[in-house]
Each structure stands twice: as C-alpha cells, then as structure tokens.
C-alpha cells in the first residue's frame, strides 16, 4: 500500500467514525473556523493580496471545498480558484457545492499545473496526515514548483500530536522550514485545543478568546510564507 492509499483509506468515512467531532453546529468548531479565517484575512491583507480578484489560488487537500468557497468573500473570482484532493467523493461534494470553482481528484505529489501557476497555495491540515517523509517532500516540492515568485503559501496545521486521531501527527515549525527552505515568513500559534473548544458550549463566546491567550493551549501554526522574487 502506498502512502497515498493509506491516507485515502484513513479519511474515507472519517466524519461518520468521528461521531460528530467536526459538527459545524458546535460552537467551539465555529469559533475555531472564525478565528482561523480572521487570521487568514489579516495575513493576506498585510501581504497586499486583498482583494484576491484575479489572483490564481490552489488549495492542496481541498476536501468539501469550504475554504475555497470562503475566498469568494475575499473578492476571489471563482474561475481563478482550484482545489485538489485525493478522495473522489470529496471532490464531487465540493464541485456540487461550489460549481464555479475547479476541483480535481489527484495526488499532490504530481500536480498537473505548469511552473509558477499560482499566486497563493493553501495547505490546511494536510502535512499532518502525511507520515511518509518522501511523500511529504514530494508534495512540498510540487507546491514550490507551482507557486509563483512573490507568491505565498498559506500554512495551517497542527503542532501537537492528536490523542483522538492516530492518523494525525504534529508538524513543528522546524519541520515546515525543512519542507520549504526557500520560503520566508513567520509562523504563529493559533486555535484553542479543539477537544477543549468543543466542550465550552454556551460559554464559548467569552471563554474561547480568554483560553486561547494561553500559548500552550494553542494547537496549530498559521502563517503566510512567501516565495522570494529572485
């Protein structure tokens, strides 16, 4: 079994097995998404990339398409957005939900795009699912290849191992630098530990921001890493 096969098998039917862990109606999950999107907007604004307009954007591991769909709120043109995912059913779900956006099934080790095709590449909780070092290096190399000089990689992934999901492993800041040595930019901690956030219930609005101020309780890294012009 290849690493890509292992990942696909691990994520087939994951939502059903997770027992509502990622329920979008959960207030903690809503707070997690809201915080990430606020941080993403700030990073793109500071980089001078908003409104997205005609910028070409690729999401590796696009899942059900929600993050690319959200970029429409940041001024992206749907025909400029592309998502790639291993699972055909996720690609089908995304294409149905966002018919104006291009979604493709494929392995990110071999992206079918020309060099420098994208101004922005998004990797949201992707590399934490790749255990094989060679595959991780291959995917990183492909991201670097299709990213234009001056473009950015939007990174968001876990910095701690998951106690509830054995198919996820931590990706430290040092590991990100190893995977993408040419890229420049800062990674900061974000996201209250999801198991804690999901248990806050009606206290979420007040408690989430307070608890998220405690650095060890922030489980993810986020950053916009730029590819030098030269």
Outline where the language-model segments fall.
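Conserved class I S-adenosyl-L-methionine
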Residues: 1-52
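Class I SAM-dependent methyltransferase SAM/SAH-binding core
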Residues: 58, 65-110
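A conserved beta-strand element that flanks and buttresses the S-adenosyl-L-methionine
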Residues: 122
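Short catalytic micro-motifs in class I SAM-dependent methyltransferases
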Residues: 125-129
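A short glycine-rich, Lys/Arg-flanked "PGG" loop and its adjoining helix->strand segment in the class I
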Residues: 137-149
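Conserved beta-strand signature within the Rossmann-like core of class I S-adenosyl-L-methionine
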Residues: 150-157
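Short alpha-helix
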Residues: 167-188
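A C-terminal cap/extension of S-adenosyl-L-methionine-dependent methyltransferases
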Residues: 174, 188-230
